[in-house]
Amino acid sequence: MWAYESVFYQIYPLGFCGAPFENDGVLEHRINKVSEWIPHIKKLGANAIYFSPLFESDTHGYNTRDYCMLDKRLGTNEDFKNICQELHENGIKIVLDGVFNHVGRGFYQFQDVLKNRENSRYKDWFHISFEGNSNYNDGLWYEGWEGNYDLVKLNLGNEEVVQHILNAVKFWIDEFDIDGIRLDVAYCLSPEFLHRLRNYCDGLKNDFFLVGEMLHGDYNQRMNDSMLHSATNYECYKGLYSSFNSMNMFEICHSLNRQFGAENWTIYKGKHLFSFVDNHDVTRVASILSNENHLPLIYTLMFGMPGIPCVYYGSEWGEKADKSQGDQALRPSFEQPIENELFKHISKLADIKKNSTALNYGDFSTILLTNKQCVIKRCVDTETVLVCINEDENNYYANFNVSANYIDLLTNKELRVENGFEMKAYSSYILKLV
């Protein structure tokens, strides 16, 4: 599967392109901005893009009006088709956000229900009671997603609804030649629906990648051979920044050992979760870390641990934003990308990751662990890699039972390890056994 050897770049198109929050219905060809950023994305080393919602919606993209029309604030389907073609020509795969649990109030079929009530042929597309009322005083009650009544929950037990979604997926593949879908709130989608979606997609395109947004619980319930290929690793997202802020590397290593360790009981061994240090829903990593010296280190650990790394646009140069400022602060438009030292570091990590069988498929184990340091081992039969982190302000001699010659892939310098080695303050290493 191509995704297991990829580095993702996430773009939230409505924000990235500077579209107004409310859909004013005015056609603007803003999506073409993506084309201007392709050289930057390639230089970063990303070879796949995950686009947050970009189809016609009421406001933020997750309240869909039409699954088969690019949002007018972004342009036309032809615009996006050209963008997809250009991305593919540059060796970049494309994953779209599939928001299939709910739609917006502007969704045609829901508007028909509001107009025709019991006589609407779409009344069973949603969970509706004509004896109640809604927060919008519609004279009927409907189920909104987690109490958000601008997000109208679809009835995925209705065959017409499922067919409508599957037809949209086929349209995306036929029209834009996309390579995968990220399933919004996948934890709300029934296993039956995901099984149906997987079978359908497998029949449309080889190696079509499905990754689901999962927060808590056992990801295996929806990530398995008959449903999703991957799931968002929110457990390790929290563990990554918390381990640096609390100077407690035991937290992230506990999660990684629980998920991918050598013991037979580990829960995700051999699987490829979607790794990230921030995204469009959370505080940016440069803001949540209490020590800016830890910023390159957290990326080294994210790229070095098992999983598929994803970088959120703007964070590759250390852009800051706090969730308390509101969602729009997390999803801004930048005039130009910035290519600073952090960008160069992540670019090097991306190159290492894409070309390392051990980092893409290798076993995981911890060979040194203290509050402020860790050394993890990734290995396959043909390659052994050590990922080493020192989050302390002081140098540290990492003492572990290994004596061999390595090359530090971050610097391309050879290093002799004799029962360990000295790590510099605020440093990270990716050591490949020579």
Where are these regions (language model features)?
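Carbohydrate-interacting/catalytic domains
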Residues: 1-50, 56, 81, 86-87, ...
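Active-site clefts of carbohydrate-active enzymes
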Residues: 267-290
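Short catalytic-loop micro-motif centered on adjacent basic/acidic residues
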Residues: 95, 180-186, 285-286
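Short, well-ordered coil/turn segments that N-cap beta-strands
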Residues: 5, 45-47, 90-92, 177-179, ...
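Short, solvent-exposed turn/loop segments enriched in Gly/Ser/Thr/Pro and often Arg
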Residues: 12-15, 49-58, 98-107, 184-190, ...
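Active-site-proximal helices and loops of the catalytic beta/alpha 8
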Residues: 114, 184-267, 301, 320-348, ...
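Hydrophobic faces of well-ordered beta-strands that scaffold small-molecule active sites
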Residues: 7-10, 49-51, 94-96, 181, ...
